[in-house]
């Protein structure tokens, strides 16, 4: 993995992203999903995780956020953050690109037209100080 400066050392953002994807995979596997593929990359976008459950193919994008809850005594919502939701980063243009990547995956992998599929989003909140994460799955997002 290379960062913008062509160094082999991953950036902090890349490290958080990798931790988030690993947490998402662990969460999905514990909940009965079978990991089929990871990091399917095209020049127009990427699918972080492809899973299968109940004969349905699920394309999962992971958004990871590093948060510091060390001084927090009261959490006001389930995600631990009132002002920012990572899923807000899913802009219409990004969804359009994801749709194209999914279509590419279906063609590249010769997936039958009869196969049901959906797009899901996993948000991962990572507290590096406490070495904890919170994972949330948003299912069947319309592209």
Model-found features: residue ranges?
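Positively charged, solvent-exposed patches that mediate nucleic-acid binding
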Residues: 52, 73, 80, 112-113, ...
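Acidic-basic catalytic patches of nuclease active cores, encompassing PD-(D/E)XK
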Residues: 1-38
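Hydrophobic recognition helices of helix-based DNA-binding modules
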Residues: 28, 105-106
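Mg2+/Mn2+-dependent nuclease catalytic core
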Residues: 67-102, 108
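Domain-level recognition of nuclease-like catalytic cores that cleave nucleotide substrates
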Residues: 107-143
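Conserved catalytic cores of phosphodiester-cleaving nucleases, focusing on short active-site segments
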Residues: 28, 47-71, 79, 98
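Short acidic/glycine-enriched loop/turn segments that link adjacent beta-strands
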Residues: 42-45
């Amino acid at each position: 993995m290379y960062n913008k400066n062509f160094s082999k050392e991953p950036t902090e953002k890349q490290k958080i992203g990798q931790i988030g994807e690993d947490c998402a995979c662990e969460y999905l596997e514990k909940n009965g999903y079978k990991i089929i593929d990871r990091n399917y990359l095209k020049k127009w976008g990427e699918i972080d995780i492809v899973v299968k459950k109940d004969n349905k193919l699920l394309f999962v994008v992971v958004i990871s956020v590093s948060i510091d809850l060390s001084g927090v005594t009261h959490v006001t919502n389930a995600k631990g953050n009132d002002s920012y939701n990572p899923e807000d980063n899913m802009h219409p243009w990004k969804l359009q690109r994801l749709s194209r990547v999914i279509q590419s995956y279906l063609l590249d992998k010769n997936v039958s037209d009869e196969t049901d599929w959906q797009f899901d989003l996993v948000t991962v909140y990572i507290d590096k100080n406490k070495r904890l994460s919170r994972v949330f799955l948003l299912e069947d997002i319309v592209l």
